[in-house]
Structure formats: C-alpha cells, structure tokens
C-alpha cells in the first residue's frame, strides 16, 4: 500500500528554477564559459570594486598611406618609452599605439594594400631596435619576420609570455583569454584574424575595429602585467632569461633546428 499522507515539508515554489545571478559572472569568466555568459545575459556585478579609477584618454586613429606620413610616426615611435604593436599573422597589417601625452595617444594603422611606398622598408623600420615594442606572442612574430628577411629587434615585453609566468596553469594565453582572466570582460571576436577579413568579401570595418580593440587590449595587459612581475620578483627571470630566449627560439625554428 502506498501511503499518500506521509508528512513532508515541501512547498512547490521553493523548487522553482531561478535565473543565474550576476554573481556567477567572475566565475564563468575565469572558467571561460563565455557562451553561458551570453546565454544567461550575465553582467559584471556592480559591487565589484574597480582596480583603479578610469582615466580619460583621447585616442586618435590614423591610417598611414604615404612614406612621408610614415616617417612622421616613426620619429614619434622612436622617441617613445615604448609603443604597443600588433601585427596580422601574414604581416599585411600593423597597428601601433603610442602615448603622446598623459591623456592622449595615437593609434596608427598600416596596411600593405593601402600603403603607397616600400612596404618592406616600413616593416624594417618598425621592427628595428630603435623602436621599443610591447606585443603578444613575440616568438611567433619574430619567426615570421625572419622568414621574410626582416629584423626582429626592439621587443621589450610580450604579454603572452608574462601571462604564462604569472599563471603557468591557465592553459590559454591568447589576448582574449588573458583579458577575460584579468579584467573580467569579454572582447569581441577577433574578426581581423579571419582569412578574408580585409578582402572585398570580408567586413573591413568590423575587422579594423577588432584589430584596434585587440591592440589596445595588449597595452592594457602590459600595464597590469609589468608591475605584477616586479611584485612577484620575476624581473630577472622575465627580462634576462625568458624574453631574450624568444629571439633564440625564433632563430632556431627558422633554421629548422
């Protein structure tokens, strides 16, 4: 016999399925559950304190198409303490962000199919030692430069390498993953890396926007990682061993070793 009147403290409303809370946002970001964040419409909780007060910064983007204008920017880059540089995998496009004052910066974009002068001469200047560059995945970029007979000098920081030293268990060190882990924000899709992004078949505006966003993200990661390396006393390991090793490995890979 089934007893149907057994005492049981239960209210159906207590078992209602509740919508995920925004409190899950940091956890989902750390676990890279970006699709679940989008599915549930989660947003960063408002009670999470910002790492620092936002700074007003005016950034002027400019497409550089002539050798004369390029030389103006190269002179600016050479005077800077450092610039943030991001290149397309095939070197057909480069964006360089450079601070011009405490609250102003310029973002110069260079594209092979729009540049009216010697593209390789421009690349030789950009990747020479007199321009101090912050970038991402420096070893791979240096190998590509060597394959094209270009210099590999002047790299002073690699955010992917720094991300690895700061957390060797993260597993992913692409720009979007690093940005999500440290800033709890999801970057837009890297449209600039799609095969036809800058062709007539692609959405050039979306690709250019993404290219600028990811370059800015590299700069933001540098501002976070550089002091963190100092705090953890990793300065010597990073600047004296790991970063110089990038060029050594790039040359070995280029030589087929």
Which residue ranges define each predicted feature?
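Mixed-charge, glycine-rich, non-catalytic linkers/tails in nucleic-acid processing enzymes
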Residues: 1-19, 27, 47-48, 178, ...
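Non-catalytic nucleic-acid-binding/docking modules located in mid-to-C-terminal regions
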Residues: 1-59, 149-156
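N-terminal functional modules and adjacent low-complexity/disordered segments of proteins
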Residues: 3, 28, 52, 83, ...
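Generic surface-pattern signal
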Residues: 4, 29, 33, 42-45, ...
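Short, structured coil/loop segments at alpha-helix boundaries
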Residues: 21, 30-37, 42-46, 115-120, ...
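Conserved DEDDh/DEDDy metal-dependent 3′-5′ exonuclease domain
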Residues: 62-229
């Amino acid at each position: 016999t089934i007893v149907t009147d057994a005492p049981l403290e239960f209210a159906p409303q207590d078992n209602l399925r509740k919508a995920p809370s925004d409190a899950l946002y940091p956890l989902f970001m750390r676990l890279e559950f970006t699709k679940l964040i989008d599915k549930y419409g989660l947003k960063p909780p408002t009670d999470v304190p910002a790492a620092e007060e936002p700074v007003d910064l005016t950034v002027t983007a400019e497409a550089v198409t002539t050798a004369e204008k390029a030389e103006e920017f190269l002179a600016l880059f050479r005077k800077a303490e450092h610039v943030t540089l991001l290149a397309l995998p095939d070197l057909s496009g480069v964006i360089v962000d450079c601070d011009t004052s405490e609250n102003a910066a310029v973002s110069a974009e260079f594209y092979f199919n729009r540049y009216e002068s010697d593209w390789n001469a421009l690349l030789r200047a950009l990747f020479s030692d007199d321009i101090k560059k912050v970038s991402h995945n420096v070893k791979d970029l240096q190998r590509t430069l060597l394959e094209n007979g270009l210099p590999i000098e002047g790299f002073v920081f690699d955010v992917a390498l720094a991300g690895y030293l700061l957390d060797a268990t993260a597993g992913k060190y692409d720009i979007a993953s690093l940005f999500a882990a440290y800033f709890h924000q999801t970057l837009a899709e890297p449209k600039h890396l799609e095969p036809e992004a800058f062709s007539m078949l692609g959405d050039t505006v979306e690709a250019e926007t993404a290219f600028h966003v990811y370059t800015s993200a590299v700069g933001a990661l540098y501002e976070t990682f550089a002091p963190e390396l100092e705090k953890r006393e990793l300065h010597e390991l990073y600047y004296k061993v790991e970063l110089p090793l990038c060029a050594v490995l790039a040359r070995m890979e280029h030589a087929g070793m």
